[in-house]
């Protein structure tokens, strides 16, 4: 007897484009949420867009977060309990969005994502990434009820944040390969739909990397839509698998050993060059990934991540210890093999 079930939670409204920040009130109104909103933001996005958001709501409250941490989630939850909001609005980058996502989950209320940068797919997904000491935790939470992404704001954001978002998406290519490998060798549940959507999104950015340029709303449009697709793929899968494989394990290890050196998206981008080499060999697609990252002005080497060769190799050889997730690195890779991979792909000079 067939007894399989799935529960896919997706945003109800996704609004992307020129000047759509001024349509936030209408987009939220269509959700029929009640009560006052609590706007969760950080200093820079609050200065840039906070007043425009507050002007669209009656009696909004605002909480400004300074860091991403479990303590920040707890503090925001306490603030929200005092304010008694009907819902949260997360305005900014990964920091306020991840914090608001977790706080909303604790409070049992919905939240709306209003990204001002396109640095990673957390703007849409049902996952929060929270650092704790030398470890970064990926925590499940409900995805936003709506996403309102104004390409005017995002095009004006620092270019390195946008290239990090692009690199994060491009790394989906190898994440899906790891997922398929886990299905074949460990019978891990696999979603053809989610896998295909994630892979198609990565391929779209690889093929159009030379058309994505700083300051262009058209480029911001492409990147944000790709981030939305990646987040939707994770929601369909009910897992981060469509966007997180061995390349993310390497990045998490770098977060432990070399915290703050590089952006998350840039780390997984460089890592995906090497994991693709492990999947398909010297004639595989790793060079296409590297060339796409280079076309975006994203890092392609350890040095460009602010790492020396030894730090990169140490992360590559120990990444499999991060979590019990079957990937191409299962069982680990020894130092000699890691040096060969990193050298062959140009990630280190050798």
Swiss-Prot record:
Binding-site list for substrate: 121, 168, 252
One BP term from GO: phospholipid biosynthetic process
Sites where the protein binds NAD(+): 94-98, 116-119, 125
Predominant subcellular localization, coarse grouping: cytoplasm
Cofactor binding note of this UniProt entry: Binds 1 zinc ion per subunit.
Gene Ontology MF terms: glycerol-1-phosphate dehydrogenase (NAD+) activity; glycerol-1-phosphate dehydrogenase (NADP+) activity; metal ion binding
Catalytic activity: sn-glycerol 1-phosphate + NAD(+) = dihydroxyacetone phosphate + NADH + H(+); sn-glycerol 1-phosphate + NADP(+) = dihydroxyacetone phosphate + NADPH + H(+)
Top-level taxonomic group: Archaea
Keywords assigned by UniProt, alphabetized: Cytoplasm, Lipid biosynthesis, Lipid metabolism, Metal-binding, NAD, NADP, Oxidoreductase, Phospholipid biosynthesis, Phospholipid metabolism, Zinc
Pathway listed: Membrane lipid metabolism; glycerophospholipid metabolism
A single cellular component GO annotation: cytoplasm
Cellular compartment(s): Cytoplasm
UniProt: Zn(2+) binding residues: 168, 248, 264
Enzyme class: oxidoreductase
Cofactors required: Zn(2+)
Function: Catalyzes the NAD(P)H-dependent reduction of dihydroxyacetonephosphate (DHAP or glycerone phosphate) to glycerol 1-phosphate (G1P). The G1P thus generated is used as the glycerophosphate backbone of phospholipids in the cellular membranes of Archaea.
Protein name: Glycerol-1-phosphate dehydrogenase [NAD(P)+]
């Amino acid at each position: 007897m067939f007894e399989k079930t799935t529960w896919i939670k997706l945003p109800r409204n996704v609004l992307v484009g020129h000047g759509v920040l001024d349509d936030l009130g209408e987009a939220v109104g269509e959700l029929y949420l009640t009560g006052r909103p609590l706007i969760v933001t950080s200093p820079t996005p609050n200065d840039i867009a906070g007043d425009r958001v507050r002007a669209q709501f009656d009696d909004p409250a605002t909480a400004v977060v300074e860091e991403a941490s479990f303590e920040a989630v707890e503090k925001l939850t306490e603030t929200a309990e005092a304010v008694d909001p009907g819902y949260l609005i997360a305005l900014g980058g990964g920091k306020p969005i991840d914090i608001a996502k977790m706080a909303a989950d604790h409070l049992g209320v919905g939240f709306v994502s209003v990204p001002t940068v396109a640095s990673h797919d957390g703007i849409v997904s049902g996952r929060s990434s929270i650092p704790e000491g030398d470890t970064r935790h990926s925590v499940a939470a409900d995805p936003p009820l709506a996403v309102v992404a104004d390409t005017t704001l995002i095009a004006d954001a620092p270019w390195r944040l946008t290239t990090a978002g692009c690199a994060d998406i491009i790394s989906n290519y190898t994440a899906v390969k790891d997922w398929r490998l886990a299905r074949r060798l460990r019978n891990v549940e696999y979603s053809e739909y989610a896998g295909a959507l994630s892979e198609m999104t990565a391929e779209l950015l690889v093929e159009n990397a030379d058309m994505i340029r700083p300051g262009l709303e058209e480029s911001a449009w492409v990147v944000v839509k790709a981030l939305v697709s990646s987040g939707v793929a994770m929601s369909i899968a009910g897992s981060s698998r469509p966007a997180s494989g061995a390349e993310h394990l390497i990045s998490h290890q770098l977060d432990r050993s070399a915290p703050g050196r590089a952006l998350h998206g840039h780390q997984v981008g460089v890592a995906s060059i090497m994991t693709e080499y492990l999947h398909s060999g010297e004639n595989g697609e790793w060079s296409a990934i590297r060339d796409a990252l280079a076309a975006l002005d994203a890092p392609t080497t350890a040095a460009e991540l602010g790492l020396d060769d030894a730090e990169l190799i140490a992360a590559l050889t120990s990444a499999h210890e991060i979590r019990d997730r079957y990937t191409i690195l299962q069982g680990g890779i020894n130092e000699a093999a890691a040096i060969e991979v990193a050298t062959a792909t140009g990630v280190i000079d050798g």
